């Protein structure tokens, strides 16, 4: 089975949220909602971390001021030559 996308997870989470407001959720649906939320947060964090690790920061003078921690991660992943 393919890994669900953030959009598909969010759509189902929203369906369950709407149902919870109108009719309430069964125990199975509550467990599904909790599982979907955890999956969504995991994917969100992975995506955000990847974006931060790929980022380079420059000041107004054009000098790179990327934090050393990020630079080291980039070096470890082979994304930097310096």
Swiss-Prot record:
Its main location: cytoplasm. The keyword Cytoplasm applies. It is found in: Cytoplasm. One of its GO terms (cellular component) is cytoplasm. The keyword Protein biosynthesis does not apply. Keywords: Cytoplasm. Belongs to the UPF0291 family. This is UPF0291 protein LVIS_1359.
